[in-house]
């Protein structure tokens, strides 16, 4: 009987731990005009999303000090690493910070990845990926270096290509290299690992009049990547982020002329089905990166926000009382 009780106790404890470790889908976000800071939305099923109230990191670096296109990855030690667009133009880098709990953040850094290209117009939409094989981060972004490539459908100041750096600690940074030149202006790239030697890059064809999403394939995150596919979204879509739900990949994107989100599902990045009518995202949120986090971590975010609001209310009430 004692042995049975011990076994039941172990079983119950194991189940309690499993419940406590339940993961949710979370996405970084921001609100226009992008000067407030980092926000989050959360989902239990990957389709229907709710806002997590609060602004969790106020942008302090870059010429314009904005926080757009926030991209996040969790490294094996549990640390969350965040990169973002910190300037619209006339700047040479992106913002970076890290956190263990999404509440308390390191000092923000400005990483000047295009400092050796003084004519660079911008550094847009950095996306961070962790290469488990090499134990290093890969950050890809879009920059326009005027007259570096044939203009095609875009003028010299809007002719972007994709670049990347690698780093193990965001202190020592590799030399900036060209990641992808598909023969047209492209931005907003995100890398998806399907297996150890099978990678997909989803990105925006930023040339007129298309402004839509395409994919390319590679055996390594740093490329080389294949010729761009045909587009799989309508025009005026950007900011893709990809999450696996069951045996399918969901590709979320910003339909910026409609002020809404769309979504596509696929199993192979060749055949696509539009599921925009099956998703829901609170109004006002803009594109970020989907990741997974424990239910307890997200609850801690909510509790922290509520405690902060209560403190503000109590402080305000005390101030009013003193005025009477």
What is each of the regions a protein language model found here?
Residues 4-16:
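Sec-dependent N-terminal signal peptides
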Residues 19-324:
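Carbohydrate-active catalytic/glycan-binding domains of CAZyme proteins
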Residues 1-4, 319:
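Generic short N-terminal amphipathic or hydrophobic helices
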């Amino acid at each position: 009987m004692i042995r049975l009780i011990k076994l039941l106790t172990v079983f119950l404890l194991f189940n309690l731990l499993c419940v406590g470790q339940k993961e949710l889908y979370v996405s970084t976000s921001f609100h226009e005009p992008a000067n407030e800071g980092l926000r989050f939305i959360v989902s239990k099923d990957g389709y229907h999303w709710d806002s997590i109230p609060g602004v969790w990191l106020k942008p302090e670096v870059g010429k314009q000090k904005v926080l757009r296109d926030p991209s996040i990855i969790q490294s094996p030690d549990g640390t969350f690493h965040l990169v973002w667009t910190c300037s619209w133009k006339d700047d040479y880098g992106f913002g970076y910070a890290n956190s263990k709990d999404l509440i308390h953040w390191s000092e923000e850094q400005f990483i000047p990845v295009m400092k050796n290209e003084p004519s660079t117009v911008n550094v847009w939409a950095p996306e961070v990926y962790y290469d488990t094989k090499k134990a290093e981060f890969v950050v890809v972004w879009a920059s326009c270096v005027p007259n570096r490539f044939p203009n095609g459908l875009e003028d010299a100041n809007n002719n972007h290509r994709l670049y990347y750096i690698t780093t193990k600690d965001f202190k020592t940074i590799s030399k900036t290299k060209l990641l992808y030149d598909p023969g047209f202006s492209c931005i907003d790239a995100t890398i998806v690992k399907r297996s150890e030697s099978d990678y997909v890059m989803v990105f925006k064809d930023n040339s007129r009049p298309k402004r839509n999403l395409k994919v390319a394939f590679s055996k390594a995150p740093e490329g080389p990547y294949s010729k761009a596919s045909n587009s799989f979204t309508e025009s005026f879509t950007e900011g893709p982020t990809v999450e696996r739900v069951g045996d399918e990949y969901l590709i979320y994107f910003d339909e910026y002329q409609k002020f809404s989100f769309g979504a596509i599902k696929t199993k192979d990045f060749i055949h696509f089905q539009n599921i925009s009518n099956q998703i829901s995202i609170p109004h006002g949120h803009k594109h970020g990166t989907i990741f997974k986090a424990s239910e307890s971590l997200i609850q801690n975010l909510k509790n922290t926000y509520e405690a902060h609001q209560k403190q503000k209310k109590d402080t305000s009430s005390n101030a009013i009382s003193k005025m009477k």
